């Protein structure tokens, strides 16, 4: 794999942004509303909702800086949504039983269970293989981590969104699973081309082709990128609309704060809380073992480490017992994040403050991975020497947690 150069900051403009008819539109404003947008919502009401968000949400309070991260997201109230009065019985022959109960609120334009099933189907249709490196004898898993870390840096330089990075990560992993005997000198070309495709799908003004070539310091020419683009899309069967890890996370976090909203239209949640949890996702995605778990399970398990079991079950539709394996796998990563300290929200010139948390940042995840490996070895040693298994952090019950907080 050629030496990856440090990206240079360039301004990017793009007036053209058409997508193939086989790919659904992924234009920005709200990842969570790709399929949840109400066409009848007026512009006035959207502005009112936007203003209310910033009036109600203040800066981080002192009580969020406690030792336990489980206070970051409030415990949900014990209420249930009213059943949708719309009669969908005449569609019964076209349905199948959902794997988990839909956590989505009632929607005025569609049945929330149908929307939820569609989301779950994405995880089943877009298959990934954590063992794909066995097909490539010349490659090592750490090469993937180095490549993804570099792509994060490219995204930060060009102010690309998190969804763009996670799309590129998905395209890269699924494409590599279809190939054999890829040499390491081709990895950077595959990676930058995956990001090129993702940017054209997700960004309103993606960087131009020559900028993607420039960022590789000439290692990948424009012709090579365009040729690889067609190869990747063909081998992926033109299936370019996965439900990414960060898309799942956006939905779960908005459901957690749905009681403050009138409509499930736009992502409205504290940005500071968002970046704390998404840092855990940015770190764990560098480990190829993350491909063992569905993206929805990864997002819900990451929330578990910053919340309580009741909330996770409510917003994700998964039982904690279903998430147990992934929760345990994430423990070394959560420990490394805690050791590294709290993330700060970065602001970018030309990017709205309300959209700042959606810009992919590069926070030195490769250095944190060294701590992850140390934590993994430590936990394995503890499991061998201790009769009680370690590795699963169980948050306290809500009532006990509140009493403990008051005592402090």
Curated annotation (Swiss-Prot):
**Pfam families named in the record:** Cyclin_C, Cyclin_N
What does its PTM field state?
Answer: Phosphorylation by CDK2 triggers its release from CDK2 and degradation via the ubiquitin proteasome pathway.
Alphabetically sorted, this entry's keywords are: Cell cycle, Cell division, Cyclin, Nucleus, Phosphoprotein
Q: Tell where it localizes.
A: Nucleus
Question: What residues bear Phosphothreonine in this entry?
Answer: 394
PROSITE patterns the UniProt entry points to: CYCLINS
Molecular function terms, GO-annotated: cyclin-dependent protein serine/threonine kinase regulator activity
- Superkingdom per UniProt: Eukaryota
User: What Gene Ontology cellular component terms go with this record?
Assistant: cyclin E1-CDK2 complex; cytoplasm; microtubule organizing center; nucleus
How does the record describe its quaternary structure?
Answer: Interacts with CDK2 protein kinase to form a serine/threonine kinase holoenzyme complex. The cyclin subunit imparts substrate specificity to the complex.
* Job of this protein: Essential for the control of the cell cycle at the G1/S (start) transition.
Task: Give the protein family.
Answer: Belongs to the cyclin family. Cyclin E subfamily.
Q: What is this protein called?
A: G1/S-specific cyclin-E2
Q: Which gene encodes it?
A: cyce2
């Amino acid at each position: 794999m050629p030496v990856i150069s440090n990206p240079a900051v360039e301004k990017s403009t793009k007036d053209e942004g058409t997508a193939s008819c086989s790919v659904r539109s992924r234009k920005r404003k709200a990842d969570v509303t790709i399929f949840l947008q109400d066409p009848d919502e007026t512009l006035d009401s959207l502005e009112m909702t936007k203003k209310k968000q910033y009036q109600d949400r203040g800066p981080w309070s002192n009580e969020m800086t406690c030792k336990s991260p489980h206070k970051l997201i409030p415990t949900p109230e014990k209420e249930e949504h009213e059943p949708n009065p719309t009669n969908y019985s005449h569609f019964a022959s076209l349905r199948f039983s959902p794997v988990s109960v839909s956590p989505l609120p009632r929607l005025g334009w569609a049945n929330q269970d149908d929307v939820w099933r569609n989301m779950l189907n994405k995880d089943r249709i877009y298959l990934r293989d954590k063992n794909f490196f066995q097909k490539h004898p010349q490659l090592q898993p750490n090469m993937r981590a180095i490549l993804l870390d570099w792509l994060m840096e490219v995204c930060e330089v060009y102010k690309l969104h998190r969804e763009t990075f996670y799309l590129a990560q998905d395209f890269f992993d699924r494409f590599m699973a279809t190939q054999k005997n890829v040499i390491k000198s081709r990895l950077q070309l595959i990676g930058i081309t995956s990001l090129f495709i993702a940017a054209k799908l997700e960004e309103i003004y993606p960087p131009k082709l020559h900028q993607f070539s420039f960022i590789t310091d000439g290692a990948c020419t424009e012709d090579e990128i365009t040729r690889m683009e067609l190869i990747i899309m063909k081998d992926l069967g033109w299936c370019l609309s996965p439900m990414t890890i960060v898309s799942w996370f956006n939905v779960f976090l908005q459901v957690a704060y749905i009681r403050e909203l009138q409509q499930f239209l736009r992502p409205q949640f504290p940005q500071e809380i968002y970046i704390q949890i998404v840092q855990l996702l940015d770190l764990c995605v560098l480990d190829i073992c993350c491909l063992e778990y569905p993206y929805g399970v990864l997002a819900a398990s990451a929330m578990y480490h910053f919340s309580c079991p009741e909330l996770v079950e409510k917003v994700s539709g998964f039982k904690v017992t279903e998430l147990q394996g992934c929760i345990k796998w994430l423990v070394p990563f959560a420990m490394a994040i805690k050791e590294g300290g709290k993330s700060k929200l970065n602001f970018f010139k030309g990017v709205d403050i309300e959209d700042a948390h959606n810009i992919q940042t590069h926070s030195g995840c490769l250095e944190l991975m060294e701590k992850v490996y140390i934590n993994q070895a430590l936990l394995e040693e503890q499991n061998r020497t201790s009769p009680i298994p370690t590795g699963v952090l169980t948050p306290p019950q809500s009532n006990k947690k509140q009493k403990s907080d008051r005592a402090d």
